[in-house]
């Protein structure tokens, strides 16, 4: 009987840890860092399994810490929304003190691990955690500009992989940052659209106009176009060692048109279903784009 209780307790702790760090989100973000690392390795900076593993663990800690801090800060807000009311801190399964300890440990472990790769990686991880928890999270209930602020830490992981591989932040890392920066807007605005009512309960501002209207949908289209332009910069030869072939550029452009189609569809329909579809497409888009970049590099 005691063994069964202990097993249940361990399972509950694991599930709460998984939820407070948002494991699914953390792993998807981690994929961006790994993609950036694979794009950054070369003869001068060869691939190393040890670096990749440390980047993966450190990156997970970075994202997990941000998410844990977020759930501590938004305990009362989370309890108001159907989507978040069962989170560990909001539901009372985990105390704020325990969550803060978890977040602090993840912060320390993540930054120390990334520092063993290079100082710049640790610095960008620290900046990401600070921006996400200290500026983006509090702004969510104040202004829709929170999405703009949140786009900065959200765009760091892709770039972080390149910095981990090379130890340098130049035009290449900046381009990867730019791609994921512009991607944040259609992605998060589509989430803010189809979860509009839930966010409204907690007084969270996500949409640029505050409403599910044509002006918001138009901005989704415009940022998707900026995303397409940014994603094609590497084919022009102006982004240093970050380069994609014309064939890869065609694939990247087609992916962009695919996402743009659903952005325009949101403008036409302005329904939660259209917004949710765009959100799902955006998630697939960024992963497929990164895969195209990687495959193209290693096939050349």
Swiss-Prot record:
Subcellular location, record wording: Cell inner membrane
Pathway membership, UniProt:
Porphyrin-containing compound metabolism; heme O biosynthesis; heme O from protoheme: step 1/1
Question: InterPro entries in the record, alphabetically?
Answer: Protohaem_IX_farnesylTrfase, UbiA_prenyltransferase, UbiA_prenylTrfase_CS, UbiA_sf
**Keywords tagged on the record:** Cell inner membrane, Cell membrane, Heme biosynthesis, Membrane, Transferase, Transmembrane, Transmembrane helix
Give the molecular function GO annotations.
protoheme IX farnesyltransferase activity
Q: Which GO terms describe its cellular component?
A: plasma membrane
Q: Which residues cross the membrane?
A: 20-40, 49-69, 97-117, 122-142, 145-165, 176-196, 217-237, 242-262, 278-298
EC number annotated for this UniProt entry: 2.5.1.141
Tell me one GO biological process term. Answer: heme O biosynthetic process
Q: Name one Pfam family in it.
A: UbiA
The UniProt entry lists membrane topology as: Multi-pass membrane protein
Which of the seven top EC classes does this enzyme belong to?
Answer: transferase
Q: Does the keyword Amino-acid biosynthesis apply?
A: no
User: What is this enzyme's catalytic activity, as reactions?
Assistant: heme b + (2E,6E)-farnesyl diphosphate + H2O = Fe(II)-heme o + diphosphate
Cell inner membrane keyword on record: yes
Domain of life, per lineage: Bacteria
Q: What else is known?
A: Carbon 2 of the heme B porphyrin ring is defined according to the Fischer nomenclature.
What the record says about family reads:
Belongs to the UbiA prenyltransferase family. Protoheme IX farnesyltransferase subfamily.
The free-text function statement in the UniProt record for this protein reads: Converts heme B (protoheme IX) to heme O by substitution of the vinyl group on carbon 2 of heme B porphyrin ring with a hydroxyethyl farnesyl side group.
Protein name per UniProt: Protoheme IX farnesyltransferase
| Organism annotation | Flavobacterium johnsoniae (strain ATCC 17061 / DSM 2064 / JCM 8514 / BCRC 14874 / CCUG 350202 / NBRC 14942 / NCIMB 11054 / UW101)
């Amino acid at each position: 009987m005691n063994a069964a209780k202990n097993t249940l307790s361990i399972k509950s702790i694991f599930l709460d840890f998984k939820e407070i760090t948002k494991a699914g989100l953390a792993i998807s973000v981690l994929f961006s860092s790994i993609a950036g690392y694979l794009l950054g390795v070369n003869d001068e900076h060869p691939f190393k399994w040890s670096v990749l593993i440390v980047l993966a663990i450190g990156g997970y800690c970075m994202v997990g810490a941000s998410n844990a801090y977020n759930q501590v800060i938004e305990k009362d807000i989370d309890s108001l929304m159907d989507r978040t009311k069962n989170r560990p801190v909001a539901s009372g399964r985990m105390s704020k003190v325990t969550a803060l300890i978890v977040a602090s440990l993840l912060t320390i472990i993540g930054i120390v691990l990334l520092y063993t790769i290079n100082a710049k990686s640790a610095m960008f991880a620290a900046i990401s955690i600070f921006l996400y928890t200290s500026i983006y999270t509090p702004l969510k209930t104040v202004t829709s500009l929170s999405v703009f602020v949140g786009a900065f830490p959200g765009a760091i992981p892709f770039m972080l992989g390149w910095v981990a591989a090379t130890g340098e932040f130049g035009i290449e890392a900046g381009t990867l940052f730019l791609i994921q920066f512009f991607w944040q807007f259609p992605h998060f605005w589509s989430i803010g659209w189809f979860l509009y009512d839930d966010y409204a309960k907690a007084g969270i501002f996500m949409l640029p106009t505050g409403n599910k209207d044509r002006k918001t949908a138009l901005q989704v289209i415009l940022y998707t176009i900026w995303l397409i332009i940014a994603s094609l910069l590497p084919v022009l030869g102006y982004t240093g060692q970050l380069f994609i072939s014309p064939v890869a550029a065609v694939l990247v452009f087609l992916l962009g048109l695919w996402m743009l189609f659903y952005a325009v569809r949101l403008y036409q329909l302005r329904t939660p279903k259209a917004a949710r579809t765009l959100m799902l497409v955006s998630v697939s888009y960024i992963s497929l784009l990164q895969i195209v970049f990687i495959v193209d590099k290693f096939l050349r």
